[in-house]
Amino acid sequence: MYSIRVLAIECIRLAPEYLPFEEGWRMQQELHKKITESQTNKNRQASMIFCEHEPVYTAGARTRSWEMPQNEKVIRVGRGGKITWHGPGQLVGYPILSLGATPDVLRYVRQIEEGLINALQSVGINGFRIAGRSGVWVRNGVSDEKVAAIGVRVQKNVTLHGFALNCSNDLAPFEKIVPCGISDAGVTTISRILKRTITPKEILDSVFNSICSALEYINTCRGNV
């Protein structure tokens, strides 16, 4: 029987209502439990959380102790990757959805990248992938800079964690770490690339529509979200 795949926004918490990372993690876990229990339904449901976090560093499973910034709040998380920063001006998205009985995690990451690349094109930015490195990148002269990071986990065939798109955030916090463990490339923001301010709220609609399309889900909030 045909399966209807609907991706609905569960929560939007943008400036000035920044979402504490711990609260966002609890929301993810609640949605994960709900979606895990409904995987057998013919109508496959999925949920999306969009937010700007309060300033925080998060360390993925492969982060070593010496990679942690000194005298800063760091939260250990179960996603892939290493250490990164979240905070105001950065659009964070958590798609919580089933990947089916035989999850293809790499394909899922590539779909997220595709959605973000298409969203960047809507504001005139040419983002791209780099082989062997997750996320979305842009070219700055002779060097590559990351504009979006991706770190996911799949548990009981259902996804957790997601992506972080640098929109108008301060880049200074990244100077205290080696972002995602990549020492030979920098980070940037949409606003820095375009030389004008683009906030998470301004690009949210495009990101949601593009992610839905890339994941082949029906967007229940077509138009402005």
From Swiss-Prot:
Binding site residues for substrate: R79, G80, G81, K82, I83, T84, W85, H86, A149, I150, G151, G162, F163, A164
Catalytic machinery residues: C180
Root EC class: transferase
InterPro entries (UniProt xref): aa-tRNA-synth_II/BPL/LPL (IPR045864), BPL_LPL_catalytic (IPR004143), Octanoyltransferase (IPR000544), Octanoyltransferase_CS (IPR020605)
UniProt-listed GO biological process terms: protein modification process
Domain BPL/LPL catalytic residues, every copy: 42-219
Residues carrying the site annotation Lowers pKa of active site Cys: K146
Chief localisation class: cytoplasm
The keyword Acyltransferase is annotated on this UniProt entry: yes
MF (Gene Ontology): lipoyl(octanoyl) transferase activity
E.C. designation(s): 2.3.1.181
SUPFAM superfamilies according to UniProt: Class II aaRS and biotin synthetases
Reaction(s) catalysed by this chain's protein: octanoyl-[ACP] + L-lysyl-[protein] = N(6)-octanoyl-L-lysyl-[protein] + holo-[ACP] + H(+)
Subcellular location(s) per record: Cytoplasm
Pfam families: LplA-B_cat
Pathway given in the UniProt record: Protein modification; protein lipoylation via endogenous pathway; protein N(6)-(lipoyl)lysine from octanoyl-[acyl-carrier-protein]: step 1/2
Assigned keywords, A-Z: Acyltransferase, Cytoplasm, Transferase
PROSITE patterns cross-referenced by the UniProt entry: BPL_LPL_CATALYTIC, LIPB
Cellular component GO terms held in the UniProt record: cytoplasm
PANTHER family the record matches: LIPOYLTRANSFERASE 2, MITOCHONDRIAL-RELATED, OCTANOYLTRANSFERASE
Family from the record: Belongs to the LipB family.
Primary role: Catalyzes the transfer of endogenously produced octanoic acid from octanoyl-acyl-carrier-protein onto the lipoyl domains of lipoate-dependent enzymes. Lipoyl-ACP can also act as a substrate although octanoyl-ACP is likely to be the physiological substrate.
Protein name (database record): Octanoyltransferase
